[in-house]
Amino acid sequence: MQELYNPSEIEALVQKHWHEHKTFEVTEDESKEKFYCLSMFPYPSGRLHMGHVRNYTIGDVVARYQRLQGKNVLQPIGWDSFGLPAENAAINNKASPAPWTYENIDYMKNQLKLLGFGYDWSREIATCTPEYYRWEQWFFTQLYAKGLVYKKTSSVNWCPNDETVLANEQVQDGCCWRCDTEVIQKEIPQWFIKITDYAEELLNDIDTLDGWPEQVKAMQRNWIGRSEGIEMTFAVADSDASFDIYTTRPDTLMGVTYVAIAAGHPLAEQSAQNNPELAAFLEECKNADTTEAAMASMEKKGVATGLQAIHPISGKLVPIWVANFVLMNYGTGAVMSVPAHDQRDYEFATKYQLAIEAVIKPVDGEVDVSKEAYTEKGVVFNSGDAFPELDGLDFQAAFEAIDARLTAEGKGKRQVNYRLRDWGVSRQRYWGAPIPMVTLADGTVVPTPEDQLPVILPEDVVMDGIQSPIKADKAWAETTVNGQPATRETDTFDTFMESSWYYARYCSPHADEMLDPAKANYWLPVDQYIGGIEHACMHLLYFRFFHKLLRDAGLVNSDEPAKQLLTQGMVLADAYYYTNEKGARVWVSPLEVTVVEKDDKGRIIKAIDNQGHELVYTGMSKMSKSKNNGIDPQVMVEKYGADTVRLFMMFASPPELTLEWQESGVEGAHRFIKRFWKLASDHVAAGKTEALDTSKLNADQKALRRELHKTIAKVSDDIARRQMFNTAVASVMELMNHLLKASQETAQDRALLAEALSAVTRLLYPIVPHMTFTLWNELGNEGDIEDSRWPEVDESALVEDSKLIVVQVNGKVRAKITVAADASKEDVEALGMSDEHVQKHTEGLTVRKVIYVPGKLLSIVAN
């Protein structure tokens, strides 16, 4: 065995062995318990970043641990390879996104292999290939046949100059990223999948996700947003028209003083025909940002329509206003406004001098709405002659009373609503899977016939940055269906479509069908899923929804796609910049910082880069291109080895918290690996050891063996149950300190070290697999470490024959005594009192009290 640890040589040899022996390729095996471990697959952006490395190291640790538990472990990998970044790169290079994407896949695949991740590469998928998206297209046509797909108009960002749709990322300060034209909102037809049909099940089944973080479950509950309320009808005065309103606070109904409708509401458009001020306001609203963040912060504005609504109970007339805070695609596009009991309504009413009438007050006091709305649930008052029975009722009683009356009069009904909207899957982009729908000559829209699937996206195109190549390619759009001329849909799927079912395709990636049900039902659900919490309300919700669609299509037999979810934290790094002669910030990579001075608390107070610029240090922030503080994993692997990078990633922080990148920590991880290697090397060099005879161990040897088996127990629990990989590593490091100090004089000393090295090699294997793979055979074990078993705890080793008792006299430690583990209180007292140090400090004193804390402390009080 070589004495010095050489990571580049070791890792190359081990990776070659894994490749040649197809170590991580698996098939279904009913005789074994399966374990499916999956990390969210990457977008092939060009290079791995440390966030990827953290995610995939966590997954690899879990997978390798489960393999040593004797399970049949599937850990696949692939590429989420459609999307806007490839289009942008192609536009910059006046090329096609396809070659850029495939080159990036090749490069990043090599990076993943250098890090030693134990993937089954035979199952590799790329979502941009027809072999993959063919089945997505097929499934979409099945959903259409079941009535779960429909088309309607929806708002998009539109550049009037380029006459093209823009993604949110392509809108910069309200203008087109390419030509700086002001962006407007435009209604265009788009395809939707009815996720709302599954809203109740998606919400209820959150309660079954015992292995998911509570934060993710809470975010999904809020996103689905179930509410119970009443939908009621308001008639329009002097008209046959009426409109519906939904409210979760029917107890405030008698306080309605105006109604607000969306700019896209039919009544708004009708009223604007003879109202230039309103028409201009509707145009302004069309171009407004309607994201939640923008809606929350924007100025609330409105224009009166001139119409009045009839209150469904009192018959009172209330004005109808168009307001920019009401959206047509949320609820009914109209809200009843009760300014006394809703702060937004209050501010609007104050601004436009509308009436404010309080109808709810605290149970035990009066209400004051002179400065702000009273928004709590209290008791009803001031209901007027139309419904005096409401006065004095609490929220629930008032809800029931109003529901009963409106239902009886045919003016309303109780209803459950969801905040969740149907999933818009159309994208007016090129680099995505074509939506498999066609329009016939008579205008009928039908699915592409199955024998014409896949609808292949042409890859030999040039991006001009203005129009999608398939929208410009009339020849591509022209087709025939059943002998009739037809035109293809030129929108492509939202890329969340591909990432919603990839986990299932891994089970049978080469099948000539969407899924092989037998294989899918062997592997699914995923046992451990790993990815960022930023995906809680989009990918992770669509992921769950798609699984239920697959179940209802008879392709899988489980209700949820993943049993356990781990959401890893971000990776942070130091960020530095200097200001150039133009006054712009120039961000400098931490790797280019050559001088760093710190104060006595370790805070950076001065930094200089390799060009001599004095830098401003802005603290730790998420690794990003914009701050140039990303650390290239490949540079670190070349410098320290993959095992060191993996060890640092696991040791530096609990997995769900942020990880602060510190090269000093990487160096520390490297030193630990080298120490362990040397300990093993010295042991091997000393020759063979005799068998361990636990009956012959002395007290020190028993204590060391106890530490070993306590460590095995703790590391097992940390990895399997707690998923606290950092404390698992810390426990092994602590054990290492004991091993380095242990005597090596006798044959039993060396036999005990052999047991410890064998166990620690396996404990470290999931985290540092290359070094431990090599050591396993060097230590005299047969076969590959992947085929070994996780070390078992010897419960007898944990039993202590003796205890070390601290003896205090008047609160000060005066002695430490060793007693039999089963010694009685009387025996311990007698032994403690006979100790020469205790006698010295009690001489001439009267012992007043003796307190014994079993197995730990003997406290003597004397004066």
Swiss-Prot record:
A biological process term (GO) from this entry: leucyl-tRNA aminoacylation
Residue window of motif 'HIGH' region: 42-52
GO MF annotations, alphabetized: aminoacyl-tRNA deacylase activity; ATP binding; leucine-tRNA ligase activity
Motif 'KMSKS' region mapped to chain: 622-626
One Pfam match: Anticodon_1
Compartments, record wording: Cytoplasm
Binding-site residues for ATP, renumbered to this chain: K625
Catalysed reaction equations from the record: tRNA(Leu) + L-leucine + ATP = L-leucyl-tRNA(Leu) + AMP + diphosphate
InterPro entries assigned: aa-tRNA-synth_I_CS, aa-tRNA-synth_Ia, Leu-tRNA-ligase, Leu_tRNA-synth_edit, M/V/L/I-tRNA-synth_anticd-bd, Methionyl/Leucyl_tRNA_Synth, Rossmann-like_a/b/a_fold, tRNAsynth_Ia_anticodon-bd
HAMAP family cross-referenced by the UniProt entry: Leu_tRNA_synth_B (MF_00049_B)
PANTHER family reported in the protein's UniProt record: LEUCINE--TRNA LIGASE, MITOCHONDRIAL, LEUCYL-TRNA SYNTHETASE
Protein name in the entry: Leucine--tRNA ligase
Species, as recorded: Shewanella frigidimarina (strain NCIMB 400)
Gene behind this protein: leuS
